[in-house]
């Protein structure tokens, strides 16, 4: 049996919990999320998956105080952070906490997180032998923690960029007197562009991008890449979103 620690059981930790309960009877789950009533003892776990809220400041930095504390209190086992963290953070956490900190990004939507996790390929950044015993039958790819951290940000920011581009296309079509619905259908005909993030308004019935992830990730990554071609590409993404969606408050 493998003793698996899950720290934080929101939709990310909840998807992991659901999958393991339904797919791997060789895993004993130990869950810590006091606000949700989970207070299991983590002293005998073999591996930990950590997914907690990390505040992202206006300047793009992150407050890692709680994360460092939680990792430092764990036994000497591989710790896989699943929260979106700035590139280079896993290495810093390993150095400062004296633990083996790896990164395993998640690509879930809040509306369909259980289904998303069931069908997705995993990203492994360490402890591969142990992970293949935990995620039996799952497809996976292997990379360094830094590569995985960049993967997560670049994935999310591209989603926001795609939303913004199609909002701008719709607005321009309306200014030109063209039927956006027909143009949208035509754009997708070749199959080179999938329809994800192309519908305007989006699933929430609003223009632009919102939610818990895109706004904070765009802000952080745009700040991090200032002075580079990528930073130039992202420079006006937030203000364009404000143009389409208005100002929203995000934690």
Q: Which residues make up each language-model segment?
A:
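Interdomain hinge/lid region at the active-site interface
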Residues: 149, 164-251
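Rossmann-fold dinucleotide-binding core
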Residues: 52, 78, 84-152, 221
């Amino acid at each position: 049996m493998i003793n698996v620690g899950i720290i934080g059981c929101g939709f990310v930790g909840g998807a992991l919990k659901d999958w393991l309960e339904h797919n791997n009877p060789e895993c004993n789950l130990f869950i810590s999320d006091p606000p949700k009533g989970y207070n299991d003892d983590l002293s005998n776990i073999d591996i930990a998956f950590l997914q907690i809220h990390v505040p992202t400041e206006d300047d793009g930095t992150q407050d890692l105080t709680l994360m460092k504390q939680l990792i430092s209190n764990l036994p000497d086992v591989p710790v896989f952070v699943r929260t979106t963290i700035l590139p280079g953070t896993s290495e810093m956490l390993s150095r400062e906490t004296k633990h083996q900190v790896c990164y395993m990004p998640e690509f879930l939507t809040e509306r369909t997180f259980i289904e998303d996790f069931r069908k997705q390929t995993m990203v492994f950044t360490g402890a591969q032998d142990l992970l293949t015993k935990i995620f039996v039958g799952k497809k996976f790819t292997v990379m360094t923690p830094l590569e995985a951290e960049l993967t997560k940000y670049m994935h999310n920011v591209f989603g926001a960029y795609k939303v913004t581009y199609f909002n701008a296309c719709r607005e321009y079509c309306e200014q030109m007197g063209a039927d956006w619905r027909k143009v949208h259908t035509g754009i997708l005909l070749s199959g080179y562009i999938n329809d994800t993030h192309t519908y305007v308004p989006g699933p929430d019935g609003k223009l632009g991008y919102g939610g818990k992830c895109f706004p904070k990730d765009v802000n952080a990554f745009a700040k991090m890449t200032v002075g580079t071609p990528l930073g130039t590409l992202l420079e006006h993404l937030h203000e364009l979103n404000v143009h389409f969606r208005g100002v929203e408050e995000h934690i």
